């Protein structure tokens, strides 16, 4: 009988006293940022992540709102090549939605830039 998906990471993270997730800040020699505004699939939701660690630093996300979490992750974990892009997205998305900042027009622009140009740094957000 399967209790959770393959590996059980969801149950493991949800039941952890302090869940810590690690990732490199970039992939493919810097062409892809691991920190992005939105993803098409998640294994662990925002409610399961307490601490995020990259080689850039540590983001303690406990007790923070979605906007505060985004700021903490950008400031502490995003690669310097992508920080300004992520700040730009956050600025565009705040005020357009209620509790969770999101711009549907721009949410996947970084992914689209990579698909079209091979480099997420070529992202152009729309106002």
Q: Which residue stretches match the model-derived regions?
A:
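Conserved phosphate- and dinucleotide-binding cores of soluble alpha/beta proteins
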Residues: 1-127
């Amino acid at each position: 009988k399967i209790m959770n998906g393959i590996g059980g990471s969801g149950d493991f993270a949800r039941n952890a006293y302090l869940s810590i997730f690690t990732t490199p800040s970039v992939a493919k020699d810097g062409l892809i940022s691991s920190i992005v505004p939105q993803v098409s699939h998640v294994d662990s939701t925002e409610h399961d992540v307490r601490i995020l660690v990259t080689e850039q630093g540590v983001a303690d996300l406990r007790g923070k709102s979605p906007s505060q979490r985004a700021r903490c992750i950008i400031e502490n974990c995003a690669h310097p090549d992508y920080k300004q892009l992520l700040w730009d997205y956050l600025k565009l998305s705040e005020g357009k939605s209620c509790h969770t900042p999101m711009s549907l027009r721009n949410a996947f622009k970084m992914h689209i830039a990579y698909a079209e140009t091979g480099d997420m740094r070529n992202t152009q957000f729309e106002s």
